[in-house]
Amino acid sequence: MSGHNKWSQIKTQKAKTDACKSKIFSKFAKLISAEAKKAKGNLADPSLKAAIEKAKAANMPSDNIDRAIKKASGDAGAAMEEIIYEAYGPGGVALMIKALTDNRNKATQLVKHILSENGFAIAAPGSAAWAFTKEPTTHNLQPTTTVPVAEEDLEKLEKLVENLENCEEVQEVFTNAE
């Protein structure tokens, strides 16, 4: 009767999906916590509302959202800090890497490691920022100029962005590639 136990058939699939959900939910919890701290718990704040809407769109449970807001309003835990790293990727593409962390040194080392693994490095502050403008409501970065990218460089860029987005500390990665 081996192979007839339903749990043995679904446990590996469930483990993979649960790990993926956990990673996504922890990113959203950090984002909501940071926005709630900026808004001082005001749920009417547009940036906090946007963060909550993003979390709800990813099916994050309401309990987790409430817990993240309460964590920000209380004194428990370290303060979350938003850091923006600048880099240049394959083909001269400018990268803006938005990280949210309670440990600046850890986040910097993780981003540096991922960039160096792919043959790139963090650029000086302001060296890539000129290529982007910040949207007033969503605080997302939009490229002011775009750079055409060759096919082989595009593959390297996609791999780099994927590796950065898989990092726990990194929230978003913006590029000015066409």
What are these regions (language model features)?
Residues 160-176:
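Short acidic amphipathic segments
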